Amino acid sequence: MNGTVAPALAHRLRLEGIDVVAWDRNKIAIDDPAAVRSFIEQQKPDWVCHMAMGSPVWAATMAKVCRENGIKFLFTGTCSVFDGSKPGPFPVDKTPDATDDYGRYKADCERQIVAASPDAYIARLGWQIGDAPGSNNMIDFFYRMAREKGRVEVSNGVIHSNAFLVDTADALYRLLAHHTPGLYQLEGNPGLTLYEIATRLHALHHFDFPIVPHEEPRRDIRMINDTIAVGQLTDRLPDGVSP
């Protein structure tokens, strides 16, 4: 199973004794509505969790098929549906106003999913933090920057939307198991800047590269979450030390 969040959620579900079946794009075409319907109806799952890149039409088709078959459908969105140059934190009912292609794409997915099924679960996620490089998470970003520059330069002014992958996976499981359909925002950052997060990760993982602060005006671009509990960064990160 590929991606950043999917393997973590699959692991969390298996801890609950839930069988997990991956979608093999080499066998089930995502651009063929009949194939999409056939696969879902043959599997007869309780839940379909869509965390992959793909067209909004694919997402909407899955949502529609799930609604017609009484299957819970989850789509993981992103905080990037909001314009990060504007002040936050952003409430769940704020109209998406992304200016970049990725944010607009995810917002379009949301719109088409809701049109296809008002019973869908949509969970917007922030920048995820894993345990090691190797996927699209913050630590991997740090290692790639360190290879390019010999150091990691991060903002000491911007407060990003973040959560640990393990906490996101747990929240997604609880969302499907215990909450009603709707739009949710999973936020795990109590208010740490990216530099503060990086120094705390440095203290935890003992990176072999320096962390350098980049000073800029303070800006809070987190999401507001008052619906579902998400593990906070400060629960897992020690106080930062000078890297």
Task: Outline where the language-model segments fall.
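NAD(P)H-binding glycine-rich loop region in Rossmannoid oxidoreductase-like domains
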Residues: 30-68
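NAD(P)-dependent short-chain dehydrogenase/reductase
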Residues: 114-160, 167
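SDR active-site strand-loop-helix element
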Residues: 23, 51, 73-79, 123-125
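A short beta-strand-loop structural module common to alpha/beta enzyme folds
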Residues: 19-31, 214
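C-terminal amphipathic/interface module of NAD(P)-dependent oxidoreductases
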Residues: 207-243
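Catalytic helix-loop patch of NAD(P)-dependent Rossmann-fold dehydrogenases
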Residues: 86-123, 130
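N-terminal Rossmann NAD(P)H-binding glycine-rich loop of SDR-like oxidoreductase domains
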Residues: 1-16
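Mid/C-terminal beta-alpha module of Rossmann-like enzyme folds, strongest
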Residues: 148, 169-174, 178-219
